[in-house]
Amino acid sequence: MIGSLKLNLILALSLSVVHVIWSYPVLSSKVPGKPDYFLILLSTCPARLEGSDGLAFLKPILEKTSMKRSFRNGVGSGVKKTSFRRAKQ
């Protein structure tokens, strides 16, 4: 009984962590025209995982984030400023 409860708890926590990781926005460079060195590093250093292309599953995600990074006036994060944040600056 306790073993299955622990297993269910671990499963629920791992699913919630995976959901948070996949929905968290990828940070990109804030300066327009400057490359994302993390993306360049990932594309130039393929992982060696038993004969398969290790980073092939990341390619669509990285392409999608690099297309979406240009947002209003070149701001990369896409976070809308509230009036409180504007008043602080």
Swiss-Prot record:
Tissue expression profile of the protein: Expressed in mammary, salivary and thyroid gland. Expressed in the brain, in a cluster of cells located between the locus coeruleus (LC) and Barrington's nucleus, as well as in few cells of the dorsomedial hypothalamic nucleus and the amygdala.
Coarse class of the protein's main subcellular location: secreted
GO CC terms: extracellular region; synapse
Annotated signal sequence range: 1-23
Any GO BP: positive regulation of action potential
Pfam families xrefs: Neuropeptide_S (PF14993)
Propeptide section residues: 24-69
Annotated localization: Secreted
UniProtKB keywords: Cleavage on pair of basic residues, Neuropeptide, Secreted, Signal
Database matches in InterPro entries: Neuropeptide_S (IPR028138)
Function statement: May play an important anorexigenic role. Modulates arousal and anxiety as well as increases locomotor activity. Binds to its receptor NPSR1 with nanomolar affinity to increase intracellular calcium concentrations.
Identification of the protein by name: Neuropeptide S
Protein's organism: Rattus norvegicus
Gene, per the UniProt record: Nps
